[in-house]
C-alpha cells in the first residue's frame, strides 16, 4: 500500500486548480499544465489541499494513487518555480551556443555541427561556451530534452569527454596496460 498517496498536497498561493472528472488543470505564474488522472484514483480539492484516495475494483489502485500524487505535486512545483537541468560539455573543442528561435548549436568533435531545435515552451540559457541550462514547467519534458542533448556525446569512461549533467559523476577506467 502506498504511503505517498495518503499525504495531502498543500496548494501554494497564486496557484489555480481545476478538477473536471478525471482531469486536473494547474495554472501558476510560469505556465499551465493539465493531466488525466487514472480511473482508480479519486481526487478532491478542499481548503487549499488536494487529497488522493482510491476507488474499489482496481488491484493497483494505491500504486496509481501514489503515482498520481507525485505527478500532480511535480506539476504544482513546475508552474510555481520551474525545473532546470544543467549540462556541461567537457572535451577539446566541445562547445554549445544558442541562436534565436530556441536553436542549440553543438560542436562535439564530429565533422559537422549538431543543430537541435527546442520546443517553444522550453527555455535555455548559455552561461558559458561549455554549459547549457534547460528550463521549463514540465519536469518530464525538461529531463527528456536534457537526455536527448546528452545522447549526442555521452561521457566516455577513459578520458571523461562528452556531455554530462552538472551533478553526474563519471567513473573513470584505467587504460589497458601491456
Swiss-Prot record:
GO terms for biological process: cytoplasmic translation. It comes from the Bacteria. SUPFAM superfamilies: Ribosomal protein L6. Pfam families: Ribosomal_L6. InterPro entries: Ribosomal_uL6-like, Ribosomal_uL6-like_a/b-dom_sf, Ribosomal_uL6_a/b-dom, Ribosomal_uL6_bac-type, Ribosomal_uL6_CS. GO terms for molecular function: rRNA binding; structural constituent of ribosome. Keywords: Ribonucleoprotein, Ribosomal protein, RNA-binding, rRNA-binding. One of its GO terms (cellular component) is cytosolic large ribosomal subunit. The keyword Lipid metabolism does not apply. Belongs to the universal ribosomal protein uL6 family. Part of the 50S ribosomal subunit. This protein binds to the 23S rRNA, and is important in its secondary structure. It is located near the subunit interface in the base of the L7/L12 stalk, and near the tRNA binding site of the peptidyltransferase center. This is Large ribosomal subunit protein uL6. It comes from Buchnera aphidicola subsp. Schizaphis graminum (strain Sg). The gene is rplF.
Amino acid at each position: 500500500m502506498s504511503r505517498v498517496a495518503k499525504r495531502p498536497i498543500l496548494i501554494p498561493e497564486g496557484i489555480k486548480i481545476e478538477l473536471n472528472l478525471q482531469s486536473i488543470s494547474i495554472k501558476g505564474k510560469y505556465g499551465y499544465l493539465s493531466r488525466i488522472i487514472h480511473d482508480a484514483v479519486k481526487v478532491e480539492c478542499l481548503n487549499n489541499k488536494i487529497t488522493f484516495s482510491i476507488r474499489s475494483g482496481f488491484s493497483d489502485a494505491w500504486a496509481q494513487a501514489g503515482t498520481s500524487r507525485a505527478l500532480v505535486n511535480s506539476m504544482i512545483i513546475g508552474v510555481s518555480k520551474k525545473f532546470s537541468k544543467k549540462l556541461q560539455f567537457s572535451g577539446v573543442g566541445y562547445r554549445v551556443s544558442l541562436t534565436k528561435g530556441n536553436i542549440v548549436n553543438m560542436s562535439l568533435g564530429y565533422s559537422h555541427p549538431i543543430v537541435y531545435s527546442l520546443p517553444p515552451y522550453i527555455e535555455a540559457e548559455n552561461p558559458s561556451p561549455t554549459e547549457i541550462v534547460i528550463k521549463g514547467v514540465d519536469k518530464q519534458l525538461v529531463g527528456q530534452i536534457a537526455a536527448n542533448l546528452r545522447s549526442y556525446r555521452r561521457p566516455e569512461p577513459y578520458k571523461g569527454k562528452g556531455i554530462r549533467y552538472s551533478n553526474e559523476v563519471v567513473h573513470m577506467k584505467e587504460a589497458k596496460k601491456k
